[in-house]
Regions:
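Rossmann-like NAD(P)(H) cofactor-binding subdomain of soluble oxidoreductases
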Residues: 74-124
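Internal alpha-helical scaffold of NAD(P)-dependent oxidoreductase catalytic cores
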Residues: 128-215
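Interdomain hinge/lid region at the active-site interface
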Residues: 199-268
């Protein structure tokens, strides 16, 4: 079998490394609309060969490792794939992608979301072992072909990932809280500091807490714009719930009600019981 990867940034490039190490594919080829990224990916050995988009469509298994809106646009150009082909997307929001799949390739399609990654992006961000022990969420498998489901499972298990099945609407609701909201908060924290009179002085004092909280603000704005747009309603609901918590904490501090504030923080401590 031959594998093709569309998008050779962090997720696609790291996947290329994982598939090559797994060794089940005769070759792993790639395409990136950014010619410099494609050249760099080849230099870094992320894929065996970089080709034109149409050549990737001839592969047995095709991975879409690009921003969510790019995935939707790309799927509309993929109706010429082999009847037996397996198309696997790695997008961070699922419902809109699934809603826009051309009917002729719905059985070919597997909606997957690997819960891994870093704040870095581009081919240079690719790392070996990114998918090892990572949780991969597979959505709406009942609408995918039996053969395609088995191939996808074999691949992800082969690169040492863990699998869970979920409905796409449930996925989008849940990841709004554990993935999308943290990025909103990280961008907000970074901008709050950058808009102060002397941000450099403030940041010179930064320790582990600030670095942990602001790390995600380094993430790709274009990728996250797509995710926020495609999961808009769930992201807004998560922001609303978080705003309510912040407003409550603010009110307790304003009113010198530190007992309530302590109870609130103690309740948050219980999160660690689940992690």
């Amino acid at each position: 079998m031959k594998a093709g990867i569309i998008g050779l940034g962090l997720m696609g490039g790291s996947l290329g490394l994982a598939l090559q190490e797994w060794g089940r594919f005769k070759s792993v080829i790639g395409y990136d609309h950014n010619a410099l990224h494609a050249k760099l990916a080849l230099t870094l050995g992320l894929v065996d060969e970089c080709v034109e988009f149409e050549k990737v469509l001839e592969c047995d298994v095709i991975f879409l490792a690009i921003p969510v809106e790019g995935i939707i646009a790309c799927l509309k150009k993929m109706t010429s794939v082999k009847k037996s082909a397996t198309i696997i997307d790695l997008g961070g929001a699922k419902a809109q992608i699934i809603h826009n799949i051309p009917k002729s390739i719905r059985k070919n399609f597997i909606a997957a979301h690997p819960m891994c990654g870093t704040e870095f992006y581009g081919p240079k961000a690719s790392v070996k072992g990114l998918y090892e022990n990572a949780l991969v969420i597979l959505c709406d498998l009942e609408d995918s072909g039996t053969e395609q489901v088995e191939i996808a499972k074999e691949i992800f298990l082969g690169i040492k990932a863990r699998l869970i099945k979920m409905k796409s609407n449930e996925h989008d609701t849940h990841v709004a809280y554990i993935s999308h909201l943290p990025h909103v908060l990280s961008y907000a924290l970074a901008n709050s500091v950058l808009k102060q009179n002397d941000p450099e002085m403030i940041l010179s004092l930064a320790g582990g807490g600030f670095r942990d909280m602001s790390r995600l603000s380094k993430s790709s704005p274009l990728m996250w714009k797509d995710i926020f747009k495609q999961n808009r309603d769930n992201v807004l609901e998560a922001i609303k719930k978080c705003e309510k918590e912040i407003a409550q904490a603010k009110a307790w501090i304003e009113n010198n009600d530190y007992e309530s504030l302590v109870e609130w923080m103690a309740q948050a401590n219980k999160l660690q019981e689940f992690m």
